[in-house]
Design a protein with these regions (language model features):
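Conserved catalytic or metal-liganding residues and their short signature motifs at active sites
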Residues: 1-230
Length: 230
């Protein structure tokens, strides 16, 4: 009888140990913070899980083995969605899996500054900050049909580009970016600014040309008002 009780006791202890180990691993991957800092991940089409993991600096990972185990067991290459993602401080390893699998992108700052009178320069500036390549940008800047929807043509598209910082998704298309530009353009050209430009005998497009000629001495869009007579 005592032997039977001993067997039951040992079996119960083994179950507790196993459940504790499983629970501990689950907690480590799903609840326990595993990052001491922030990391930006850029996922391009056809990237592998290992290539994405390689973008997380070892210096911010508390338990690297746990991260590898959780991500490799929760993600496969085909789960990855292109985009810019941010690993936040104090998040558990499983957050990386959920973020990448669900496409929880974080926007990036698209900075447009300096002279905007050369399409090649604009194309390179945008392509250097986005998933787009410079050829895609250049094609859009020469697309008569696309530009017509904004009230512009390839030869005056420069007037649509207002130097500023824009929050966009890294995977944004050129149409998305031009939508942002048009919104900024329309927001700037209030009745008051239109009247100021008209008083000087200038159209909004002509004001933009003048602003470019002086090399956009400020990257802050509202300073166009000084050129428009403000």
């Amino acid at each position: 009888m005592k032997t039977w009780k001993l067997i039951v006791l040992v079996a119960a202890l083994l179950v507790i140990v196993i459940l504790g180990a499983v629970g501990g691993r689950w907690y480590a991957g799903n609840r326990k913070p595993n990052f001491t800092g922030k990391a930006d991940l850029y996922v391009r089409p056809q990237m592998t899980v290992d290539e994405v993991l390689a973008q997380i600096p070892d210096s911010i990972v508390i338990n690297h083995r746990n991260l590898i185990h959780v991500v490799r067991n929760g993600l496969i290459d085909s789960d990855l969605k292109p985009g810019h993602y941010v690993v936040e401080k104090n998040k558990p390893s499983v957050y990386v899996v959920r973020m990448l699998k669900n496409g929880w992108q974080s926007p990036v700052n698209l900075v447009l500054s300096g002279t905007m009178r050369q399409k090649g320069r604009i194309a390179r500036k945008i392509a250097n900050q986005m998933m787009l390549d410079s050829a895609e940008v250049a094609d859009a800047l020469n697309d008569s049909s696309l530009l017509a929807s904004y009230g512009f043509i390839p030869s005056d598209v420069f007037s649509l580009i207002i130097p500023d910082t824009y929050q966009v998704y890294w995977t944004a298309s050129m149409k998305d970016i031009l939508d942002k530009q048009k919104a900024a353009y329309d927001a700037f050209w209030t009745d008051e600014n239109l009247a100021k430009a008209e008083a000087q005998g200038l159209t909004p497009k002509q004001v933009s040309i003048v602003a470019s000629i002086v090399k956009s001495e400020s990257n802050y869009a509202p300073e166009y008002s000084s050129i428009a007579g403000g």
